[in-house]
Amino acid sequence: MIDRLRGQLVEKDPEGVVVDCGGVGYRAAAPLSTLRALPAVGEECVVHTRMVVREDAMLLFGFATREEREAFDALTSVSKVGPRLALAVLSAMTPGQMMEAAARGDVHRFAAVPGLGRKTAERLVLELRGRELAAAGGGGGVAAGEGDGPFMEAREALTGLGYSLEEAERALRDVPPQETVEQYIKAALRKIGGRR
């Protein structure tokens, strides 16, 4: 298995990268975030990789960080999510944003990814919720209480009252963890009222 490549970056295009390691050029498909993070063509780079072996092909996928690679692994562990779809998700959001969206139950964020339908987005949220990426150093990026029922119900209630999803989430993030939906809503409304 090829775990990482270190060498000269000889090609970078929307499909991925080619890294020259000791005279051998390895092509790896990569998300847009990796393409942006890597240095210019001709410079030395390190690409963390994941090899996928299929009946008809051996595919190499490259990432700028181990956290991205771990997020790729988490995505491809979900039924109906293949490597290409996982790259599309990582091109649309960072691993931290991905895990936060899953913790919040934000199906719309996943469904906005090109090629990802609503049912697959729901499956991603269901299977990724509660997971942590070890490469992130244990920080899930979501404060305590945000991924649970009362927080989610309060968010839905606030959007039902006419507040935008962004405004509701911003207010709820500013509130310390609460026991009930009603407590979340009251505290969030005070925050929103204080901003106006």
UniProtKB/Swiss-Prot annotation:
Keywords: Cytoplasm, DNA damage, DNA recombination, DNA repair, DNA-binding. GO terms for cellular component: cytoplasm; Holliday junction helicase complex; Holliday junction resolvase complex. SMART domains: HhH1 (SM00278). Residues 144-153 are annotated as: Flexible linker. Residues 1-64 are annotated as: Domain I. Pfam families: HHH_5 (PF14520), RuvA_C (PF07499), RuvA_N (PF01330). The keyword Cytoplasm applies. Residues 65-143 are annotated as: Domain II. SUPFAM superfamilies: DNA helicase RuvA subunit, C-terminal domain, Nucleic acid-binding proteins, RuvA domain 2-like. Coiled coil: none annotated. Residues 153-196 are annotated as: Domain III. It is found in: Cytoplasm. Belongs to the RuvA family. Homotetramer. Forms an RuvA(8)-RuvB(12)-Holliday junction (HJ) complex. HJ DNA is sandwiched between 2 RuvA tetramers; dsDNA enters through RuvA and exits via RuvB. An RuvB hexamer assembles on each DNA strand where it exits the tetramer. Each RuvB hexamer is contacted by two RuvA subunits (via domain III) on 2 adjacent RuvB subunits; this complex drives branch migration. In the full resolvosome a probable DNA-RuvA(4)-RuvB(12)-RuvC(2) complex forms which resolves the HJ. This is Holliday junction branch migration complex subunit RuvA. The gene is ruvA.
